[in-house]
Amino acid sequence: MVEAEDLQSLKTIALLGGCRGPIWLSSQSLGSVLGISPQTASRRLIALERQQFVTRSMKPDGQYVAVTREGEQALKREYADYVRIFNPDQRGYTLTGTVISGLGEGRYYMSIPHYKEQFGGCLGFEPFPGTLNIRLDAASIAVRKHLDHAGWIDVPGFTADDRTFGGARVLPCLIRGYRCAIVVPSRTHYPEDTIEVIAGCELRKALNLNDNDTIEVEITHD
């Protein structure tokens, strides 16, 4: 869990523009905004960098700080908590799309034992070695943008046999009563209209799905 003071500092850096790219930021200026000493501000920057929430670089005119993807995710998780507090009636989202054929990457990655163990540990089911690929309709593409604030689970990467495997994010969901999860590999950039879904069974066979069939994905939170 992120310490409250680190989260406060991270939020301040983001408000100053750190999510858009490196910004000039001295320890003294950060301390002035937060109402703390430059020494304390420096320690917080070091702590954020250690957690890989920010990057720091020195240039002739001073220090530049940028919020990383991990830092953005920490802020989005905090935002998701506030959504649950102030908008309790928003219990979930529904994505609608059509089934499409994938390129086989999902089958490969889901067949790697360490991936299967990690996904099984955080989702409560051992994933079938393959994914269901869905192309979203226009309305669901817009809905998908809100999912950045949903309850994603980070799955860390690992190294095996001198090869590095990237991490991923998974979002628990339901398809016609089957427990599933949307999976987004950290090293892959998918079009905004496409999602990959994993489950404990072969969804195509279990639900008798073919390419171009319409399907709904339900994402809920407590």
Swiss-Prot record:
Q: Where do the annotations place FMN binding?
A: 188, 196
Q: Is the keyword Chaperone assigned to this protein?
A: no
Of which family is this protein a member?
Belongs to the archaeal riboflavin kinase family.
Under which name does UniProt file this protein?
A: Riboflavin kinase
Which Enzyme Commission number(s) are listed?
A: 2.7.1.161
Task: Give the species this sequence originates from.
Answer: Methanoculleus marisnigri (strain ATCC 35101 / DSM 1498 / JR1)
GO biological process entries:
FMN biosynthetic process; riboflavin biosynthetic process
Q: Which residues bind Mg(2+)?
A: 131, 133
Reply yes or no: does the keyword Magnesium apply: yes
Quick one: where's region Unknown? 1-92
Q: Which InterPro entries match?
A: RibK_CTP-dep, Riboflavin_kinase_archaeal, Riboflavin_kinase_CTP-dep, Riboflavin_kinase_dom_sf, WH-like_DNA-bd_sf, WH_DNA-bd_sf
Keywords tagged on the record: Flavoprotein, FMN, Kinase, Magnesium, Metal-binding, Nucleotide-binding, Transferase
Q: In which pathway does it act?
A: Cofactor biosynthesis; FMN biosynthesis; FMN from riboflavin (CTP route): step 1/1
Q: Please name the gene that encodes this protein.
A: ribK
- Protein function: Catalyzes the CTP-dependent phosphorylation of riboflavin (vitamin B2) to form flavin mononucleotide (FMN).
What is the reaction catalyzed?
A: riboflavin + CTP = CDP + FMN + H(+)
A GO molecular function for this record? riboflavin kinase activity
The ranges of region (Riboflavin kinase) come to 93-222
Q: Which domain of life is it from?
A: Archaea
What are the required cofactors? Answer: Mg(2+)
Q: Which residues bind CDP?
A: 102-107, 201-204
